[in-house]
């Protein structure tokens, strides 16, 4: 059994909150959206930050640590310190993982549980335009027991949702991230036979656009979308995937049906996989 979240929450004021325990590391927007509010189906075809892998630096974007966060007017800030990579992989000095995010809401202020974000609100929060920058860093945050290396990453993202005059909703999200590590899947430590926590070194970008039709058809509304993802490692060839999809939104994030066609060779490692063309039908149900 996996423990996803286990934390103490000290919530003094909207501008000052402290979460301590096993919790989500401040990340870029796809990381804070999670899989349950995504407008697209295949969003995890890009390289991840270290805690996002199911490995020694965290699980599902979580690690043990603390996050100071809050909202002041239109500014939203996150400052975190975490355990990050374990000493079994070369972090013998127990260097910590530092993570931070600063976002600014130019129009309506986004409202979510805690410091999470969403990939679409289906127009329920009005007109939104948010930009953000994210940083993560850990000395000895990659490599092996015999030969450790550092991890550093930054990301920029933008999110816009606009309710049009016909009550339709246009949603746009885009982001760019760059990850700098000493050891990668393609360039592991040469002087060691130990297991390696090797990541991606390079840059990645994505963009998603969708439109929610205003008129209901039966119990739901149709939302066509397109998403493009591109990965550019420094030690291998580039890869990309394009996804065309159609959501049938019945009850927001609680109930929807997805049909999508995806073409390309991008995957979560950041390195090119098989070049495939797939058609997927999915059902999202959440009870809360």
Can you name each region flagged by the protein language model?
Residues 1-87, 92-112, 178, 199-215, ...:
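Outer membrane beta-barrel
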Residues 245-276:
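Internal helix-turn-beta structural module
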Residues 95, 107, 111-233, 240:
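Detector for outer-membrane/organellar transmembrane beta-barrel domains
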Residues 13-15, 72-74, 126-128, 165-169, ...:
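Strand-connecting loop/turn motifs
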Residues 98-109, 275-288:
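Outer-membrane beta-barrel "beta-signal"
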Residues 18, 131, 170-174, 207-209, ...:
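Hydrophobic beta-strand residues in large extracellular and virion-surface proteins
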């Amino acid at each position: 059994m996996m423990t996803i979240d286990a934390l103490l929450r000290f919530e003094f004021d909207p501008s000052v909150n402290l979460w301590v325990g096993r919790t989500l590391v401040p990340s870029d927007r796809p990381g804070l959206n999670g899989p349950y509010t995504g407008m697209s189906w295949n969003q995890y075809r890009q390289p991840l930050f270290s805690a996002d892998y199911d490995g020694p630096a965290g699980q599902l974007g979580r690690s043990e640590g603390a996050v100071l966060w809050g909202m002041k007017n239109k500014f939203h800030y996150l400052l975190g310190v975490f355990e990050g990579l374990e000493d079994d992989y070369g972090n013998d000095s127990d260097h910590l993982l530092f993570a931070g995010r600063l976002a600014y809401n130019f129009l309506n202020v986004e409202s979510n549980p805690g410091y999470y974000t969403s990939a679409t609100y289906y127009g329920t929060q009005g007109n939104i335009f948010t930009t953000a920058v994210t940083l993560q860093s850990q000395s000895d945050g990659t490599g092996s027991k015999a030969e450790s290396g550092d991890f550093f990453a930054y990301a920029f993202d933008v999110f816009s949702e606009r309710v049009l005059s016909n009550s339709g909703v246009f949603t746009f999200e885009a982001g760019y991230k760059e990850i700098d590590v000493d050891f990668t899947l393609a360039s592991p430590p040469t002087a060691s036979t130990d297991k390696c926590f090797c990541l991606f070194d390079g840059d990645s970008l994505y963009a998603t656009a969708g439109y929610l039709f205003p008129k209901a058809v039966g119990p739901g509304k149709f939302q066509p979308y397109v998403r493009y993802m591109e990965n550019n490692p420094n030690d291998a060839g580039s890869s990309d995937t394009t996804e065309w999809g159609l959501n049938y939104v019945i009850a927001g994030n609680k109930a929807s049906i997805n049909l999508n066609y995806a073409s390309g060779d991008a995957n979560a490692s950041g390195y090119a996989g098989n070049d495939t063309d797939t058609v997927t039908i999915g059902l999202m149900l959440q009870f809360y």
